[in-house]
Amino acid sequence: MPKLAVVLLVLLILPLSYFDAAGGQAVQGDRRGNGLARYLQRNGRDNEAECQIDTPGSSWGKCCMTRMCGTMCCSRSVCTCVYHWRRGHGCSCPG
């Protein structure tokens, strides 16, 4: 089998959810539903974890341990999410 065909086959087999261009961490929930996403949304362990489920009924989502802003993950929990005209959402952090 040519190298290109092998590479394409591997890329088709790997789930695209492993790759997150938005900067957040893609995580997999348990097989019984979105248990991990629900756990992270409970804001346990003194963090402000937020999860965005990609599609309803899916166990895949982007979870951020600070603050979600659109599809981005802000660097700190004190940051606020703002919308810039023509540039989209962005994080505004004090100091």
Curated annotation (Swiss-Prot):
Compartments where located: Secreted
Keyword line: Acetylcholine receptor inhibiting toxin, Disulfide bond, Gamma-carboxyglutamic acid, Hydroxylation, Ion channel impairing toxin, Neurotoxin, Postsynaptic neurotoxin, Secreted, Signal, Toxin
GO cellular component: extracellular region; host cell postsynaptic membrane
Domain of life assignment: Eukaryota
Disulfide bonds: 64-73, 69-81, 74-91, 79-93
Propeptide cleavage-removed residue intervals: 25-45
Modification type 4-hydroxyproline: residues: 56
Modified positions (4-carboxyglutamate) in chain numbering: 50
Entry GO MF terms: acetylcholine receptor inhibitor activity; ion channel regulator activity; toxin activity
Tissues where the protein occurs: Expressed by the venom duct.
Endpoints of the signal sequence: 1-24
UniProt function note: Alpha-conotoxins act on postsynaptic membranes, they bind to the nicotinic acetylcholine receptors (nAChR) and thus inhibit them. Through its two C-terminal domains, this homodimeric protein would bind to two nAChR allosteric sites, located outside the nAChR C-loop of the principal binding face and at the adjacent binding interface in a clockwise direction. This toxin specifically blocks mammalian neuronal nAChR of the alpha-7/CHRNA7, alpha-3-beta-2/CHRNA3-CHRNB2 and alpha-4-beta-2/CHRNA4-CHRNB2 subtypes.
The family this protein is said to belong to: Belongs to the conotoxin D superfamily.
Assembly, per entry: Hetero-, homo- or pseudo-homodimer (identical sequence, different post-translational modifications).
Swiss-Prot/TrEMBL domain comment: The cysteine framework is XX (C-CC-C-CC-C-C-C-C).
Descriptive protein name: Alpha-conotoxin-like Cp20.5
Record organism: Conus capitaneus (Captain cone)
